[in-house]
């Protein structure tokens, strides 16, 4: 049976979490206390798997507080399989906490950072500071307010073996398990003060069917995992461009059927048409949007079509920006492509009608695209003919690859290795004589990838340096076809 140790300073909520986990299942043993203080040990059931829970709470608060916590914590941690390191989310992270956490990671155990006392939405921003610990297994919770504990339970559950699943829960409910072979941890002669953690205790009512709401922002990482399990197989792709560039022809070529009406009359497609297909276990939903014209030419029902097109883009993951390679590019092409940028979509630039374009000027045409659409520099370019279906099949694998990039989550530790190298190569310029420091970076969202840069003076992150960091990230990771967004944030900023 796996052992789970709850470790941390006094008054961070260890006993509260211990009690919360115990309330999930009432298979309880009794504590025996004497001149030594026993580690509290209980059998618990996480969803339907058994585990042994260890609480190292109750360490005395002497002048050598943290040295004692470290000694006892490491002793308990060495005997555990899973370690929950708890900190106070209302306080700024301390170097001693980080140092101990790093030591716990060297034990080769499953270690999670549990940031307690995130009691309301205003306190959620406090989690940013704890990404300094360099772990992706971070959970912002409030035991006393019963917020976001469920995400932590699921993380623990995934690390418990299948053989620990309880086969007969009815029998188990009647069993009062007494733990044998309790290990004792010596204390100095100071008395244990249980009141240290009483303010954090949470004693729920007898509601066995109580639900745990997952609303944490740690969350960003937890939601990333949740998304990977549920929505990763569905990619929504909007086909956009000005009128008569061949969007409907491209949709038909992709589907292999005449799903969308094709005509030389500009604006044949009024209502966005969506069609789904399966490709390599992925569901691809293509949306043929209404062709967009210059504002002065938009009349009547086309106004509604434009509104629908914008709505579809807001709900899409990716855009195929269709350009007519046989004609000069227009300012309107740039404005339409700007919708991709404003919606932060993954993107492929499609040069259609390549069969009638001047292919001898390939390099010139590609360069013109890059010059006109600099804001889509991350987007690959595909030349094809929707009418003859030539090279259309190239799009499918490209879509899957780009969506993978768009959905990826870079580990905090890996991200900061790249950041450190970039900073060593080119230091941040000062701002009005003031030194600018970047502390760390962490990815907090996907689709698109969003990265927080935590620094002393966020306004000091010049756009040229931001571009430099973006380029370094693109060199280190696969971000082809996807924008990478940065948010400069001050340490401890709410």
Curated annotation (Swiss-Prot):
Keywords of this entry: GTP-binding, Nucleotide-binding, Repeat, Ribosome biogenesis
InterPro entries, per database record: G_ENGA, GTP-bd, GTPase_Der, KH_dom-like, KH_dom-like_a/b, P-loop_NTPase, Small_GTP-bd
Keyword presence, NAD: no
Domain KH-like, residue spans: 408-492
GO biological process terms held by the UniProt record: ribosome biogenesis
Keyword hit for GTP-binding: yes
Binding site for GTP 2: 241-248, 288-292, 352-355
GO MF term set: GTP binding; ribosome binding
Binding site for GTP 1: 8-15, 55-59, 116-119
PANTHER family: GTPASE DER
Reported function: GTPase that plays an essential role in the late steps of ribosome biogenesis.
Protein name, UniProt field: GTPase Der
